[in-house]
């Protein structure tokens, strides 16, 4: 069964297209008009082995907030749609990933119950402007938006880090690895991996 999705969403603030294939090879085509965000989403696709296409345009002349948030919303919706009924997946996964001095730990439960816990970023991280457009405060917000619309429980802990770029990128790479493992088919799992029979 193909685990793919294509979702478009347009508002007065942005237009977003996301296409993904959970069983891809990590091929990406990303254009959000926010260069650092493009870099992070490229890393997400590469290290999750999802094939990922993202095209987003928004009112970045005001702020990049709407474009970043709306892209995370559509990405979450596409992830959820591609998973289907979640039969046979591992469901739980975690990953710890370094980037030089930065270290991030991400735990995922593809539970159908959205939640996001985000802790440990160094003091002042939220005020840094990364790549000229992306403020550090957007990281938590986009992760919350993704988790809510993907309907996953997501725990992100930054264990170490100093460089603002590295702190964010370690989180994206750890998220990518955790998602990859969580959605992998487990040949020992019969049906839905829940005692309730539904996720």
Swiss-Prot record:
Major localisation: cytoplasm
Which biological process annotations from GO are given for this protein? L-histidine biosynthetic process
**Pfam family, any one:** IGPD
**A molecular function GO annotation:** imidazoleglycerol-phosphate dehydratase activity
Task: Name the family the entry cites.
Answer: Belongs to the imidazoleglycerol-phosphate dehydratase family.
**EC assignment:** 4.2.1.19
User: Catalyzes what?
Assistant: D-erythro-1-(imidazol-4-yl)glycerol 3-phosphate = 3-(imidazol-4-yl)-2-oxopropyl phosphate + H2O
Subcellular location field: Cytoplasm
Keyword annotations: Amino-acid biosynthesis, Cytoplasm, Histidine biosynthesis, Lyase
This chain's protein is named Imidazoleglycerol-phosphate dehydratase
Where is it found, in Gene Ontology cellular component terms?
cytoplasm
In which pathway does this enzyme or protein participate? Amino-acid biosynthesis; L-histidine biosynthesis; L-histidine from 5-phospho-alpha-D-ribose 1-diphosphate: step 6/9
* HAMAP family in the record: HisB
